[in-house]
Amino acid sequence: LSAISDYEIESTVMVPTHFVRLLDLPKGVRDKYDVSSLKMVTHTGAACPIEIKQNMIEWWGPVLFEAYGASEVGTTCSITSEEWLEHPGSVGQARPPFEAIIFDDDGSPVERGVEGRLYFRDKTGRGVVYHNDPEKSAAAHIEPGVFTLGEIGYLDEDGYVYITDRFSDMVVSGGVNIYPAESEQVLITHENVLDVACIGVPDKGMGEKLLALVIRDSSGVSVTEEQLISYCRDNLTHYKCPKKIEFISDLGRTTMGKINKRKLRAPYWENFQG
């Protein structure tokens, strides 16, 4: 905030974790800095909870610009603040040369509003190419030029894309599909939660159960597992909420705000005997 104010920064790139930490600052601290020079704040790297983004737009104005895509293909979708306020939660419409398509598990296109696997048709025919990994490149395609980045989502009637989770992150507990992102977006709004990641861990009875790994903020060291589970249940259907919460100090986020959930899951599965 000091740099934005002192140097009259006009554009910058952030991830949602930055927004959460900025909003956690006391209002008196935030109000000390002039951020009126900002014209564009691009955010990417991770999903941004609706409440967090709304609060940032109220504070900084309609300068947030969200980009969704991958290093291997660039930006596939984008959305301005003005568009987002009309389509809250969306990552935007597909941008040329891409077209967004939702498929079911059998590879058939689904109707607008129906959740499924998010794919993009690259009208250049290139698709996604992972460096020195032809097998991964091939596995990402359902047909030539039509690829997925691994997300689950849906399209609204106006063609805006909404992402609900990732294929690989989905937890199957007692035959029910649970999307960790739903719990994450609730828990991150708790005043004592600085960061969170939900993962599937082994459960002999249910196959998997949802575990939330939580970083508490410095003022929330006394918040308990029971309090956070109760908070989640107050805001989400019970079966979608974590069965257990562990408090940790680091989620291993990259500089782009991404978390390697496979790495987080590994210790729980290594010695599990089903």
Predicted features and spans:
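AMP-binding/adenylate-forming catalytic core of the ANL superfamily
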Residues: 4-5, 12-15, 109, 121-122, ...
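Glycine-centered tight turns that cap/initiate beta-strands
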Residues: 37, 61, 97, 192-195, ...
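Gly/Ser/Thr-rich phosphate-binding loop
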Residues: 1-4, 9-14, 23-87, 99, ...
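Hydrophobic/anchoring residues in structured secondary elements
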Residues: 40-43, 198, 246-247
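Adenylate-forming AMP-binding core of the ANL superfamily, especially NRPS adenylation
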Residues: 47, 86-132, 140
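Acidic/polar alpha-helix N-cap and adjacent early helical turns
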Residues: 267-274
